[in-house]
Structures are given as C-alpha cells and as structure tokens.
C-alpha cells in the first residue's frame, strides 16, 4: 500500500510543476488509487479480525464460497468475509492481501501476499439443547419414575419440590441423564440421592411474576414465555442446585462430564438466574437481604482433564450490584477451559449473601444450549 501513496504524492507534485493542462487522466488514476487504498484498508481490517479470532480461541464451524472469496463462520456465531481476488480468481499483488484460501477437513489455510500463512482450526459444533426433537439417547429407567425415560421432558419433575423424580419419597432417586449420540455430556443428582444433594435437573417451568418464587418453584425461570422459557424461545433447559464452601455440609460441587471419557472443548452455554434466586436478589427473603451496590453472585466454572487435573477456571457474574442482576439468557464462554473431561460449577457470593452456615441466597442457576467442539 505504501507505493500507492508514493505514486499519489508524485502525481500531485507534477501538477504544481507543469501548470495548466488536461488533468482528466490524472484524476482518473487518483480515483483508481483511492479505490485500491480503500480495498487495502478493508484487507487490514479483515486481517485484524482474523488475528483477533485466533487470540480469542475461536474456531471455524463452517465456510461458504462467495463471488470474491470466502465467508467464514466462527464458533461464537460471528462471521467474516475474506476477499481473495475478483470474481473468485486468486488474489494478485495490489489486489488483495489474501493470495489464496485452502479448505481441508480440519482447517482453513489462508496465504497472505508476503508468503505468511494463517491456519485456523475448523470443527463441528454439537449442541445439547434438552429439546425432545433432538433426543438421540435410548430409553432407560430411573427408580423414582414409573415410566421409561424416552425424551428430555420425561425428566421434568412435578411438583418441582418433593416430586417422585428428584426426591422419590426422600430416598435414592438415581436421577441422571446422558446426551448419548450427540455431545456425550452427562449429569444428574450427586450420589443418586434427593435433589438437595445438588445436581442438574431438566425443567420447562416459567414464572412471569417472580415475586412469589420460593423453593417450591425451584426449577422455574422468569425469562421468555410460558410456551418457551428456554434460550432462544426453546421449551426445555437445565437447573443446577448446589454449591460447596467451608461452611456447607456438601463436599461435591455439581458438575457435568463426558460420559465416554473423551476430553473436548465446551465452547459456551447460555445461563440465567432462576426465579427463586432472582427474587431473593431483587427483593430478599427470610434468609437473605436484597442485593446492594456491592453485592456480587457468580458461577465459578473449573475444568478437569481425564486424570483429574485442573485445566483452568472462569467465572460468570449472575449479580454485580443491585442494578446488574441477570434475568436474560446470557452467553457464558467456556472455551478458555481448554479440553476437559468434566466441568464443575460452584456458586459463590459476597459477604452480605452469606451467613453462619454458608450461602443465604438460593444456590441455583439455569443453563441451556451447551455447545461442544468435535
């Protein structure tokens, strides 16, 4: 691009030296140069976006050939168009920074005009939706259920508290689920006991008026609609109950894991407060006061490899002061945990949310649409 500006400067200087003459050809060249400078500016912006994608750990989930190059679709839902020449031809010096784009089964290889090569991984994203239409697991039984579990909605208990699936007369429930044939993620209730042990339960419950939410509506959220309270208007989602700190009697942090014991990157999922937790943070309850300016409440996600070693930890703020309490499905990036066999999700709160026996705020959050890289 430097030579464009050099030529432009020389051309303009020649005008001052030669005086009056027919300059239409010169201005035509200048207009062409402006177009080339603009094109190179767009290339610089595209290159910056590619570097940013690599730095943020994004991977390509799909490609689409366009008239002038490629459209790349990334794992976070964003896309980027790369022009590598006119009408599909390879880019030439002065035409594009991008000389060629090569696609393999696992990568997209971009060659720049100076010979440098950018290689971006390409993966398949599989999503755990909890929707009946996406079921791939085979039928199975759990002790508290008088019918076979054939679809996700069969795992939704009624009533929400004290029901047969999650409590089974307050004895062993064996409540568990496995997204077999898809993401291979699995979870359930810790030690197979009642839901107060902590764990992950499927739900579709919705409360428009969260002000009456309590432990009896522990599986409800107040985002979406009664027809679709899940992320993006879907019906079903999952609710975690439980946490561990130095005051609680529990020792196992709720988690999900890959049932086939293969390490994978969990790219992201969507989370929100349950109605019960949201009501407590907004209005307080018999155990906890409403959130103040300095109140915080967060999910702490920790990844583990197959040998049980920690890979990394990341956090999501469910409450960051009284004016920032989450009540919409919000993306939680988990890709920074790297390849994991298991992820634990602990709930941690500020001092005003805790008492002599641990958290006073209801230890729940809801999640949906867990995206896994394959």
Could you describe each region identified by the protein language model?
Residues 124-252, 261:
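N-terminal targeting leaders for non-cytosolic proteins
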Residues 78-87, 116-124, 129-131, 259, ...:
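Short amphipathic beta-strand/extended segments with alternating polar/hydrophobic composition
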Residues 1-4:
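Positively charged n-region of N-terminal signal peptides that target proteins for export
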Residues 15-19:
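C-terminal motif of bacterial Sec signal peptides marking the signal peptidase cleavage site
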Residues 261-268, 339-340:
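Extended extracellular/luminal ectodomain segments enriched in beta-structured repeat modules
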Residues 280-299:
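Short coil-to-beta strand junction motifs in C2/discoidin
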Residues 21-124:
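Collagen/collagen-like triple-helix sequence repeat recognition
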Residues 295-374:
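Terminal, low-complexity interaction segments
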